[in-house]
């Protein structure tokens, strides 16, 4: 199974997960042209897409979904709350109602050779989820836009071979930055975003011998930067309370404006 971050950041998100027979996207929050270029970089065409799974209705996760649906008739899987939110976002354009497929929280959906589970998360959206994906041999998770993590989330994210985990902001940069007070409180709240430190603490709960690839994603342009996110998370892993601190895990930061390295698990 392959995982490719086509884009990840506060300005747009799109992640490819697939194998030889099945190709899906988690979110489509960038232009259709960028999505197609990212897919083409690994030999996949837009017409090969079997489904797009949407985490929630914020524009940085759905801005390209209308283009994809109209061009390729690709099914769109999302919770009913997310579908309602997409339907009222005028900039997305018209989407054929028949392309929408409702996925319920904690439900498993089979698409081709992949089994996808929608895991409920805490974020200021209608009915947000993150996703775990498996082909029966390998396991991956895309987990961003979480203000906090619960034991249920930890339980669902354990045992992955690859994971893209939110490391949205540095708390100090956010607090002294230019954002208005209400927005700072939103980001820092339980329905906001994971900080670098909390991403590292969550990662400590998820480490195991077979975790081959770790992406840090959804970085804020204004309140974070790649080196800081990487160093903070690595510090939490090295100094944190976990039995794997001495092991060499591959951690990389998913790029905002460029396709990241594809990983195979």
Regions found by a protein language model. Give the residues of each.
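Active-site metal-binding motif and surrounding structural segment of the metallo-beta-lactamase
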Residues: 33-79
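Short, basic/aromatic-enriched C-terminal tail that caps enzymatic domains
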Residues: 249-265
């Amino acid at each position: 199974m392959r995982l490719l971050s086509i884009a990840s950041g506060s300005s747009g998100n799109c992640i490819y997960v697939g194998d030889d027979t099945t190709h899906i996207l988690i979110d489509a929050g960038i232009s259709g042209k960028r999505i197609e270029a990212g897919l083409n970089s690994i030999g996949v065409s837009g017409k090969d897409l079997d489904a797009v799974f949407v985490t929630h209705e914020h524009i940085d996760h759905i801005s390209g979904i209308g283009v994809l649906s109209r061009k390729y008739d690709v099914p769109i899987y999302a919770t009913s709350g997310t579908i309602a939110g997409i339907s009222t976002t005028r900039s997305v354009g018209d989407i054929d109602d028949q392309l929408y497929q409702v996925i319920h929280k904690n439900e498993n959906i089979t698409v081709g050779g992949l089994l996808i589970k929608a895991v409920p998360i805490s974020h200021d959206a209608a009915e947000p989820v993150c996703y775990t994906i498996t082909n029966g041999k390998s396991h991956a998770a895309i987990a961003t836009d979480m203000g906090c993590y619960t034991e249920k989330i930890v339980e669902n994210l354990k045992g992955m071979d690859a994971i893209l985990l939110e490391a949205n902001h540095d708390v100090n940069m956010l607090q002294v930055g230019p954002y208005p007070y209400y927005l700072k409180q939103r980001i820092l709240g339980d329905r906001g975003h994971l900080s670098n430190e909390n991403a590292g603490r969550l990662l400590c709960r998820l480490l195991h011998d077979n975790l081959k690839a770790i992406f840090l994603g959804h970085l804020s342009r204004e309140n974070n930067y790649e080196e800081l996110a990487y160093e903070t998370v690595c510090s939490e892993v090295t100094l944190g309370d976990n039995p794997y601190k001495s092991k060499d895990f591959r951690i990389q930061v998913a790029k905002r404006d460029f396709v990241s390295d594809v990983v195979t698990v």
